[in-house]
């Protein structure tokens, strides 16, 4: 199934947290927090301005982003978990 977000919404796939720390400590599932980093899968057309035109989005498909722990709405599509969030919920784009 293909999803196209509406307005200024963004579809994000969470990136999995590391299983082992740099020091070699294995992190059990019960101690893991939800990662606040993800990849942008799809982007809506942008917020609608007063003149009827869409404002340009600051993120695009493929961007790695940081977001608030409680951002977005969790959805499941074809047994995969995603977040749908507003662009305002994205804190930063990670540049390589």
From Swiss-Prot:
Q: Which Pfam families match?
A: Cpn10 (PF00166)
Signal peptide location in the record? Answer: none
Location(s) in or outside the cell: Cytoplasm
Which SMART domains does the entry link to? Answer: Cpn10
Cited InterPro entries: Chaperonin_GroES (IPR020818), Chaperonin_GroES_sf (IPR037124), Chaprnonin_Cpn10_CS (IPR018369), GroES-like_sf (IPR011032)
Gene Ontology cellular-component annotations: cytoplasm
* Entry keyword Cytoplasm: yes
Out of the domains of life, which is the source? Bacteria
GO biological process assignments: chaperone cofactor-dependent protein refolding
Q: Give the main localization category.
A: cytoplasm
Q: Which UniProt keywords apply?
A: Chaperone, Cytoplasm
- Which protein family is named in the record? Belongs to the GroES chaperonin family.
Q: Which PANTHER family match?
A: 10 KDA HEAT SHOCK PROTEIN, 20 KDA CHAPERONIN, CHLOROPLASTIC
Function description? Together with the chaperonin GroEL, plays an essential role in assisting protein folding. The GroEL-GroES system forms a nano-cage that allows encapsulation of the non-native substrate proteins and provides a physical environment optimized to promote and accelerate protein folding. GroES binds to the apical surface of the GroEL ring, thereby capping the opening of the GroEL channel.
Fill in the subunit field for this protein: Heptamer of 7 subunits arranged in a ring. Interacts with the chaperonin GroEL.
Q: What is this protein called?
A: Co-chaperonin GroES
Name its species. Solidesulfovibrio magneticus (strain ATCC 700980 / DSM 13731 / RS-1) (Desulfovibrio magneticus)
Q: Could you tell me the gene encoding this protein?
A: groES
């Amino acid at each position: 199934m293909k999803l196209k977000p509406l307005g200024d919404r963004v579809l994000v796939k969470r990136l999995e947290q590391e299983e082992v720390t740099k020091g070699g400590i294995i992190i059990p599932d019960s101690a893991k927090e939800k990662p606040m980093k993800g990849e942008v899968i799809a982007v809506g057309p942008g917020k609608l301005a007063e003149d009827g035109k869409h404002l340009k989005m600051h993120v695009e498909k493929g961007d790695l982003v940081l977001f608030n722990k409680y951002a977005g709405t969790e959805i499941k599509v074809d047994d995969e978990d995603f977040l749908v969030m507003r662009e305002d919920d994205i804190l930063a784009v990670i540049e390589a």
